[in-house]
Amino acid sequence: MKKKLGLLAMVVALMAIATGCSETGQPITSKSTGIWNEYFVYPLSQLITYFADLFNSNYGLAIVITTLIIRFALLPLMIKQTKSTKAMQALQPEMVKLKEKYSSKDQATQQKLQQEMMQLYQKNGVNPLAGCLPIFVQMPILFAFYHAIMRTAEIKQHSFLWFDLGHADPFYILPVVAAITTFIQQKLAMAGTAGQNPQMAMMLWLMPIMILIFAINFPAALSLYWVVGNIFGIAQMYFIKGPEIKASKAGKAGGSSK
């Protein structure tokens, strides 16, 4: 259930970006109406503008700084999500045994399976939906930031490094880096689980491809946001799951040397 919700969240996020393009053509201002614009998009647009003014109208640097601020603010939720995922992974062997024990598809057997599953969760203090809540809390914030970048008119009038923020990267460097960092981040996040869930393994490749397509066609400002966010996510995953990944590799190396 939790994995399906996580997959749904990623798909919804991509659909939201794709279907939100019609509104992104409307600049965000203090006169923009609606709860979404007034309380989500406009404040983030103002935050970007504040840092741009602070650094001599450097909107590229402002996007980098604002992205990092948002990521640090969401970090506790990400840590909670990761811990919940690890707790669920630890229960996988027992969950598999229960599914084998109650393999019959009749309603009575399936109800018994659900009861046993809930008892297993309660016994180990695990909430199967705890890892999904952070995803749905983050999505509105990150999507609002996407809108703030796309709808802040001043961003389109400035450049950063080798690219114009209002146009796609002419050298395709940012789209490629965005796709690669998306892949690395997801690879770290799915370490040890992709083989257990074919759907997640599929998303490991699908997400970078879709990000590449979006980044090639969207303004470089959005690609910059993706790259910075992904690099932060990679560092975050390394520090959270790094010891676990190293231990897994050491175990495999030790087993192969025997």
From Swiss-Prot:
Disulfide bonds: none annotated. Residues 1-20 form the signal peptide. One of its GO terms (biological process) is protein transport. GO terms for cellular component: plasma membrane. It holds the Pfam family 60KD_IMP. A lipid is attached at residue 21 (N-palmitoyl cysteine). HAMAP family: YidC_type2. Required for the insertion and/or proper folding and/or complex formation of integral membrane proteins into the membrane. Involved in integration of membrane proteins that insert both dependently and independently of the Sec translocase complex, as well as at least some lipoproteins. This is Membrane protein insertase YidC 2. It comes from Bacillus cereus (strain ATCC 14579 / DSM 31 / CCUG 7414 / JCM 2152 / NBRC 15305 / NCIMB 9373 / NCTC 2599 / NRRL B-3711).
